[in-house]
Amino acid sequence: MDLYREEILDHYKNPRHFGPLDGFSQKAADRNSSCGDSLAMGIKVKNGKIADVKFTGVGCAISLASASMLTEMLKGKNLVQAVKIDDAAMLKRLGIPISLTRQKCATLGVAIWQKLRPLLK
């Protein structure tokens, strides 16, 4: 379990695919009203695959780390594979038990991904 915690901290301190969403035509955002976490994500699809994905925002370690992990899970996937990524997949990917109160933090990125999915078809 320590390896998972170390990976979460690494993604929090060094988020992957984090930055401005300039140039992304497909964007969505969401906010966790219970804690104030706020994230936005942009996706580029080319030839049926997620060619690029970025996120930006502010939040706790869990929301930022899980968004970073989610971008890694999405990038390079074809859309058929990518639509299978849901809350359960994200919680499994984190690899540690997440309390009910923190699950919304952990799945905020997935909520944004679900908003983006219809825009990609």
For the regions a language model picked out, list residue spans one by one:
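Domain-level signature for proteins that mediate thiol-based redox and metal-cofactor handling
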Residues: 1-121
